[in-house]
Amino acid sequence: MVYSYTEKKRIRKDFGKRPQVLDVPYLLSIQLDSFQKFIEQDPEGQYGLEAAFRSVFPIQSYSGNSELQYVSYRLGEPVFDVQECQIRGVTYSAPLRVKLRLVIYEREAPEGTVKDIKEQEVYMGEIPLMTDNGTFVINGTERVIVSQLHRSPGVFFDSDKGKTHSSGKVLYNARIIPYRGSWLDFEFDPKDNLFVRIDRRRKLPATIILRALNYTTEQILDLFFEKVIFEIRDNKLQMELVPERLRGETASFDIEANGKVYVEKGRRITARHIRQLEKDDVKLIEVSVEYIAGKVVAKDYIDESTGELICAANMELSLDLLAKLSQSGHKRIETLFTNDLDHGPYISETLRVDPTNDRLSALVEIYRMMRPGEPPTREAAESLFENLFFSEDRYDLSAVGRMKFNRSLLREEIEGSGILSKDDIIDVMKKLIDIRNGKGEVDDIDHLGNRRIRSVGEMAENQFRVGLVRVERAVKERLSLGDLDTLMPQDMINAKPISAAVKEFFGSSQLSQFMDQNNPLSEITHKRRISALGPGGLTRERAGFEVRDVHPTHYGRVCPIETPEGPNIGLINSLSVYAQTNEYGFLETPYRKVTDGVVTDEIHYLSAIEEGNYVIAQANSNLDEEGHFVEDLVTCRSKGESSLFSRDQVDYMDVSTQQVVSVGASLIPFLEHDDANRALMGANMQRQAVPTLRADKPLVGTGMERAVAVDSGVTAVAKRGGVVQYVDASRIVIKVNEDEMYPGEAGIDIYNLTKYTRSNQNTCINQMPCVSLGEPVERGDVLADGPSTDLGELALGQNMRVAFMPWNGYNFEDSILVSERVVQEDRFTTIHIQELACVSRDTKLGPEEITADIPNVGEAALSKLDESGIVYIGAEVTGGDILVGKVTPKGETQLTPEEKLLRAIFGEKASDVKDSSLRVPNGVSGTVIDVQVFTRDGVEKDKRALEIEEMQLKQAKKDLSEELQILEAGLFSRIRAVLVAGGVEAEKLDKLPRDRWLELGLTDEEKQNQLEQLAEQYDELKHEFEKKLEAKRRKITQGDDLAPGVLKIVKVYLAVKRRIQPGDKMAGRHGNKGVISKINPIEDMPYDENGTPVDIVLNPLGVPSRMNIGQILETHLGMAAKGIGDKINAMLKQQQEVAKLREFIQRAYDLGADVRQKVDLSTFSDEEVMRLAENLRKGMPIATPVFDGAKEAEIKELLKLGDLPTSGQIRLYDGRTGEQFERPVTVGYMYMLKLNHLVDDKMHARSTGSYSLVTQQPLGGKAQFGGQRFGEMEVWALEAYGAAYTLQEMLTVKSDDVNGRTKMYKNIVDGNHQMEPGMPESFNVLLKEIRSLGINIELEDE
């Protein structure tokens, strides 16, 4: 394997056996690709904004004399960049400008004669833009649009599985679901009549739809039935025979022909009889007259002499009717062929319950059902029916819908119109009747071929279209109002409805969610989440078990493990590692093609629909060198079932063992040894890990860590290769390699790092460089680590030395005992940043003022404020401290004469304002790390605001001039090269000042041209610099766009350092979670023979019942990794020669059977080997991929190499007594996470506080500063103890006896410790409640 310079710093030993055929794809592509499709110009007009515009435009006036046409659109540049938007609290968006053309036609002239054309660019609101990491910044906060899994448009055949009717009869139904428009349902009732519903309203007989489509009874019967033809000859009744139809019937008369009896009366007709009839080519048989009675006529029969209707289609024949028909000369009678087995008389029966008899009555019936209570007119009824399914504006199946529709009806072509045709409706009815007749199967709604993904781009497009349609109405009105000569396109378009629709979607849609930003993994998972909830989806309450369940088609598309616990289980899923969506929005997963029994490296992506036709082998099937299967029988999946197939039957093979799971689950080592429920918890808890102060890569990983860290966007990644030219804490400069430069550029890349900013979850985002000066880097190398990343690998927690043993009950029931050393070394110390805002508004009584002059506040409380009344940076503050002093004018109150006198003497100020300062919330303490002041345009800036501005300007100038210097240096080095090549002596040149170099002339014309080009570039560079500086200055000094009535906003950022303490929640990666019960002194912890104490003691009883054995294997392997690290460390300390180190490290990497990774240290320089050894001294990181991990024997080998016992257990001694514990204990290294459930955020106590309005009881919860509820069970406890007085005070004065508690307060003040309990307020509420039910209830005083 070839490693880049940065990757050589620390190589993970990989235990994977299967070769990696396909690299892990870019993990955020589902978001970025979808949005790209939305905003990029699509010449076909299939997707995105283009499609939305084309579907609404051209807009014609009602008269048709003018129309507004769409030409093209363009997106402008965003005003602020992403960081500025976050700081200012605005949306990161770009203006949308659309070129429209107004065409006015001549009124009197022939059609299409143009009178006037006006073209203009019109502003149509702002479109939020996606950041590079797949998020949106809306009002300053990062949000994610979650993809939705909804039912694909198309036609679905389903049954109620016998649940609707008490008889248990299975009722079948068909539903046509368009992308937008009305749903059309067909369903059978228990009497086998076929009904139709439109938009789930009242049901009507299904034949009404056919009548509305202008079919007569005769045509309807002709469509749905086969015919039986009877002929009257010589007063005998003969029937045309189709032998196949007789199968399974019982003969009601002798079947004879040509004097031969084929079936005797009363006998069952079998296949043998049918073969004989076919062999003798029997076409007609004689039947008795009784046989025809009860048959149904297929068409109308009219007496031609009188013109009178003898019998209408769908009438039952009787002997009288037969005689009439015979008399009027009808010798050939067509009847419907029906039987109970596979040709039911459903449509014929339905026609009998159908009240309508022609098109008009059918249309009226539909109109009455859709618009009850409105008087139907012919026109209204016709237009309503037309608009339901046959109008492009109101109805659209979409390309997906048409494809699914045609596939379901087994048609050849998959493209077609977006509206329904007559044939579509009839074919659906025919297929439904076939299914009722026992031919064909119902669809499985939970099959991923019937559910598709709607991503950001598509949802935004739909919202945008909604806005356009609102505008369309207004435009039509304007076009009709006349005076078109002076009208311009922009006078007609109001951008408000469009931007409102888009804003509503991004701001408040159920699928637009506040990004989960705890750590890089939670970001990635959130962006790859797939929800079945949301508009047009399911609701929690109505979703049954089937929808939530794992389906065979989830394999490789949706993760079977990662889903929330609780009411949303199974409704919110995570995309599998390799899954992607196809053009129709269905999930597909990659497979390796198998041709002629050889597994090739050709990759095909298959959707769930296509996959059903193939036999697919698992990724862990063994192959030989050429790619043949080793075993004769291979475990494969086919049509959702798993079984053994011979190797020639295999069509495809899985790409990777981790294809099944999502990113979160693929980070759990030894996942294959964990119970699914615990794996689910493990995958979910990794997302709650708080980034620690110093990230520590996991010793035991899965090899996915690098992909997650790089794709999440929290690290700085090199865009192009080069050499590190400058590096400090906040920026990295790279001189780009010659071959990667664009022609005519300076060849310098500058990466500015993010420093100590707040995430959505109040954790700290900070980037630290991990390259040093002069290092070569390649494209894609990690230059700086972000939160929870270590040398470009995801690092959510810390490697802790754990022992599985009981310790004095401190690890009872999943409690965790932690050593004090963990606290001392700050292993789990985290930084949290809180943003506190103070808003100064304009009130009716005057503006609020931000000032240090606050009434009735002592000098001490103001000690941390500057003269503007704002806290200074670096101040350490605790709960209740003032951060921003603010006073609010208060209303004039009636003054007493004394007060008037005092005011006259001392002046006004003190009494007419009240203190409304921003204070630190209770229980919070920390350091002020940043202050920002936003001032409204036109409001005078205070001193602090000007200082901050000055500082920002200085910083911006410094940044830009440094940037300029770097670029200049790059440019001048190229100028120097040209001059030297052109014959100028290098020494003389260096003595000349750089600015004068460009004045030199060269004799070589080509070199002179190059020099002139470089001179032009230099001028451009300086010009660009001035432009940038001016733009920055404008941005910094301009006023801010604040909400109405807001004059100033001051934001204060507090950094809080949280050490680990009892009550904090910790977890491993296998769902093994617990709460810290005690921080134990180091000297009391169990220690091994070398005197090394353990860091954490876990309860061994937490393992067997939970069945997550992965944690034990991880512990053993972690021990081995650490053992090898210790040996390398010892060698480094003894300063042994490089060759020995190289040999030992090579041995460690080569260990294990047939490992896919081949590390060849002979290609490394000595310096590189030393650097690698330096990075391995804390332990050799190991990857054990999911379902392809290290085997037990390999772990033992590795333990042996690290000179450790292969049992993984060692003797421990009690730290307090020094005695040995009686049996060896499992000790090793486990990766532990600190979860974002910190005791500091949960601890809370109340002395006095607010009460609920109605019940007058104290509120509950920390946010409301509430009390602890003394509930029903607690009352029982006091009752059981007979503690009557305690109980009385609990239920009265301490809760909601209003008078009692006031009196009590008064008594305590007076020093009289007595209470007088009265009536609790909640009792009065109960009385009122009973009275509201109409029952009078009164308290009688005796």
Swiss-Prot record:
Top-level enzyme category: transferase
Positions where N6-acetyllysine occurs in the chain: 1022, 1200
Database matches in Pfam families: RNA_pol_Rpb2_1, RNA_pol_Rpb2_2, RNA_pol_Rpb2_3, RNA_pol_Rpb2_45, RNA_pol_Rpb2_6, RNA_pol_Rpb2_7
Catalytic activity annotation: RNA(n) + a ribonucleoside 5'-triphosphate = RNA(n+1) + diphosphate
Single GO molecular function: DNA-directed RNA polymerase activity
Keyword list, A-Z: Acetylation, DNA-directed RNA polymerase, Nucleotidyltransferase, Transcription, Transferase
Entry GO CC: DNA-directed RNA polymerase complex
Signal sequence range: none
TM regions (residue ranges): none
The EC number(s) this enzyme carries: 2.7.7.6
Source organism superkingdom: Bacteria
Family to which the UniProt record says this protein belongs: Belongs to the RNA polymerase beta chain family.
HAMAP family, alphabetized: RNApol_bact_RpoB (MF_01321)
NCBIfam families in the cross-refs: PRK00405.1, rpoB
Functional description taken from the UniProt entry: DNA-dependent RNA polymerase catalyzes the transcription of DNA into RNA using the four ribonucleoside triphosphates as substrates.
UniProt cross-references to PANTHER family, sorted A to Z: DNA-DIRECTED RNA POLYMERASE I SUBUNIT 2
The name this protein goes by in its record: DNA-directed RNA polymerase subunit beta
Species of provenance: Escherichia coli O81 (strain ED1a)
